[in-house]
Curated annotation (Swiss-Prot):
It comes from Mus musculus. This is UDP-glucuronosyltransferase 3A2. The keyword Glycoprotein applies. Highly expressed in kidney, while it is expressed at low levels in liver. Not detected in other tissues examined. Glycans are attached at N52. It is a single-pass type I membrane protein. UDP-glucuronosyltransferases catalyze phase II biotransformation reactions in which lipophilic substrates are conjugated with glucuronic acid to increase water solubility and enhance excretion. They are of major importance in the conjugation and subsequent elimination of potentially toxic xenobiotics and endogenous compounds. One of its GO terms (molecular function) is glucuronosyltransferase activity. PANTHER family: EG:EG0003.4 PROTEIN-RELATED, UDP-GLUCURONOSYLTRANSFERASE 3A2.
Length: 523
């Protein structure tokens, strides 16, 4: 009986410890489908780790299968008026056209951020939502660092937060103290970590250029800040970035270039990894038709799949017809041009089980848009890639794919059936690409902890320690001239020039004195 009581007491104590450790965490997802997928996965990981999770979700038409999701945690949905959604759809379409035809896109990108700034103002004006979030008294907020509005939400709530970066960490070199530009390529530069002299010149100039563009982007939220924060306590977005307790980066060094990281930076690329399931029988039957030749998987992302032009579809379809492999292609059947006959070795579907197909033993190649989630899945399964990057982080991801010899990238503007077919055949037949993909797979799998375990472990760490002040370098508080030792350089330069000037003056005086003395002696 006594033993039973002791066991009962220990059970209650253990339950109490679990309840004490469970934190109330808010996650914020207000961007497009790929961002939504990652933040939803993060929310699920935190929930499964014993935390009470609430997700603030922007219910957008851009999020596929939204209504199919049945999360086990609380979700707060909000949606802007229909005319606002139409405005964003028009802006997105314009941006896509500019990218497709190689025109400048920065001004349209500014308009998109201006739209997001207006959208943010609407959300901050939703008293019902903001009051609910305040009353919940969350212990921590996890946000997408690309969603600048979420920084303002957190500032309104006055809560600690951790930031999830869905891109390469190089994107934050414009908001955080940057790694040396001599070997850390700037986001958007198209460079690798091995730069010659002119590469370093380009990298430096790109850093200056994008820094100015980043300021323009941040300025699109100025009116929202002025409207919702009282004068004298209006936050600066670039300063809010530095407040993050932790930075989770959706990448892995199996893909990314090695670089120094801050102690509060954790790479968790591969969060979307999940157990492989058998593929549907109709897909298995299609693949088996091609025997040892195998198949090619084509998936160009949720947004890109909706905007593929007739010309692009025609060229790709013609290229696939030249392959001995079968081709499984994620392409909306409603978008397929009526006057284009589907190649006999191609099967198109609105949706495909991408993870399960990448793990299939008969896969030979993955044709991708180069989105981080898709690239990490390919690395996880050791599948070579051909990338057709469209925008944002996709070109940068493909630079890394090429540098690691995991595949090649082709430009959308120059995509032609013949050259596209030759490129795919080259990657399939040249065993060096498959070998490099398998080597990256080994690196990716050799971590002692899974991405989910790393994320959960570090979240628990800062909850237990009351924050991550012990992990933040003083560089976050330093003015840029101190951080880059410019003041020391100028001081030493001034000291050197002063010493040189004084030495010249003394030398001139001594020379003049000796000259006069010589003349006196001669007289």
């Amino acid at each position: 009986m006594a033993a039973h009581r002791r066991w009962l007491l220990m059970s209650f104590l253990f339950l109490e410890v679990i309840l004490l450790e469970a934190a109330k965490i808010l996650t914020i997802s207000t961007l497009s489908a790929s961002h939504y997928i990652v933040i939803s996965r993060v929310s699920q990981v935190l929930h499964e780790g014993g935390h009470n999770v609430t997700k603030l979700l922007y219910e957008s038409a851009n999020i596929p299968d939204f209504r199919k999701e049945k999360p086990s945690y609380q979700v707060i949905n909000w949606r802007p008026p229909e005319d606002q959604e139409k405005k964003f759809a028009d802006l997105r379409h314009r941006l896509t056209e500019e990218i497709t035809y190689g025109r400048s896109k920065h001004h349209t990108l500014l308009k998109i951020h201006q739209y997001f700034g207006d959208l943010c103002s609407q959300l901050l004006s939703r008293k019902d939502i903001m009051d609910f979030l305040k009353n919940e008294n969350f212990d921590l907020v996890l946000l997408d660092s690309m969603d600048l509005c979420s920084l303002l939400i957190v500032e309104k709530l006055g809560k600690r937060f951790v930031s999830f970066l869905p891109f390469q960490f190089s994107y934050m070199d414009f908001g955080l103290p940057s790694a040396p530009l001599s070997y850390a390529p700037v986001y958007g530069s198209g460079l690798t970590d091995q730069m010659d002299f002119w590469g370093r010149v380009k990298n430096f100039l790109m850093f200056l250029d994008f820094s100015m563009k980043q300021r323009e982007i941040l300025s699109q939220y100025d009116s929202t800040i002025q409207e919702h924060f009282v004068e004298g306590s209006q936050p600066v977005l670039s300063d809010l970035l530095l407040k993050a307790e932790l930075w989770f980066v959706n990448s892995d060094f199996a893909l990314d270039f090695a670089r120094p990281l801050f102690p509060n930076t954790v790479y968790v690329g591969g969060l979307l990894d999940k157990p492989v399931q058998p593929i549907p029988q109709d897909l298995e039957n299609f693949i088996s038709q091609f025997g040892d030749s195998g198949f090619v998987l084509v998936a160009l992302g949720s947004i890109v799949s909706m905007i593929q032009s007739k010309e692009i579809i025609k060229e790709m379809n013609s290229a696939f017809a030249h392959l001995p492999q079968g081709v499984l292609w994620t392409c909306k059947t409603s978008h397929w041009p009526k006057d284009v006959s589907l190649a006999p070795n191609v099967k198109i579907m609105d949706w495909l089980p991408q993870t399960d197909l990448l793990a299939h033993p008969s896969i030979r190649l993955f044709v991708t848009h180069g989105g981080m989630n898709s690239v990490m899945e390919a690395v996880h399964h050791g599948v070579p890639m051909v990338g057709i990057p469209f925008f944002f982080d996709q070109p940068e991801n493909m630079v890394r794919v090429e540098a690691k010899n995991l595949g090649v990238s082709i430009q959308l503007q120059t995509l032609k059936a013949e050259s596209f077919a030759l490129t795919m055949k080259k990657i399939i037949e040249d065993k060096r690409y498959k070998s490099a993909a398998m080597a990256s797979k080994i690196i990716r799998h050799s971590h002692p902890l899974t991405p989910a375990q790393r994320l959960l472990g570090w979240i628990d760490h800062i909850l237990q320690t009351g924050g991550a002040a012990h992990l933040k370098p003083y560089a976050f508080q330093q003015p840029w001239h101190e951080q880059y030792m410019l003041d020391v350089f100028l001081f030493l330069l001034g000291l050197m020039l002063g010493t040189l000037w004084l030495s010249v003056k003394v030398l001139v005086a001594v020379t003049r004195y000796l000259s006069i003395a010589t003349k006196v002696k001669e007289a």
